[in-house]
Amino acid sequence: MKLNERSVAHYALSDSPADHMGFLRTWGGPGTPPTPSGTGRRCWFVLKGNLLFSFESREGRAPLSLVVLEGCTVELAEAPVPEEFAFAICFDAPGVRPHLLAAEGPAAQEAWVKVLSRASFGYMRLVVRELESQLQDARQSLALQRRSSWKSVASRCKPQAPNHRAAGLENGHCLSKDSSPVGLVEEAGSRSAGWGLAEWELQGPASLLLGKGQSPVSPETSCFSTLHDWYGQEIVELRQCWQKRAQGSHSKCEEQDRP
């Protein structure tokens, strides 16, 4: 792998936030100068993304080494010196020796192993796939919940089947859906302007509820002319009786006036 040393050094010293940093002891890793003794070299390490930089000190202005954390695993290891909490960065490529490091304590060792194991793009791809799977499961679960909630709401709000049975009348007619008392009265009111007074009196609320052409007294009448004749006979009889009475009273008065 070829890197631009100036660009890499600028990135290592830039103000970009670091994922982890601290002192580690190293034993002759890639890019690290060997030490005369077996105690290793204590350096300041900075992790940015998948790049692990090492410096001579915390105030160092030039990185000593760079480890690209791709195609590798982080494992616990034995340090050459006792009482050291060591771990190794092992690469899959043949001929590349492990990079042996040691932390100052068990907590620091655990923290470094954790962050270095999660620094590669391969790990990020696994996390993204897992998150996508969880998101898909959550969407499917939400869709099922919405579907079940809509079904429950629809079952509660399901309209009842209308009763199509209508009560039949004697002449075979029945009330339509608009033949309610209010609708019939409104319909009669809209037509009352063209009707005569006698016709309006005959078509009262009781007759309107029965339907057109029907009478509460004589259901066999089927039209206005028949109804008019039927009531007219009674009126003619009453008129004849009244005329007879009037003629009788007039004749009595004439007899009383005679000497």
Curated annotation (Swiss-Prot):
Task: Enumerate the Gene Ontology biological process terms.
Answer: endosome organization; receptor recycling; retrograde transport, endosome to Golgi
Q: Which SMART domains match?
A: PH
One Gene Ontology cellular component: clathrin-coated vesicle
Task: List the GO molecular function terms.
Answer: protein homodimerization activity
Main localisation? other
Q: Which InterPro entries match?
A: Boi1/Boi2-like, PH-like_dom_sf, PH_domain
Domain of life, per UniProt, equals: Eukaryota
Assembly, per entry:
Forms homodimers and heterodimers with PHETA1. Interacts with OCRL and INPP5B.
Domain-level remarks: The F&H motif, an approximately 12-13 amino-acid sequence centered around Phe and His residues, is essential for binding to OCRL and INPP5B.
This molecule's function is given as: Plays a role in endocytic trafficking. Required for receptor recycling from endosomes, both to the trans-Golgi network and the plasma membrane.
The entry's protein name is Sesquipedalian-2
State the organism of origin.
Homo sapiens (Human)
Q: What is the lineage of its organism?
A: Eukaryota, Metazoa, Chordata, Craniata, Vertebrata
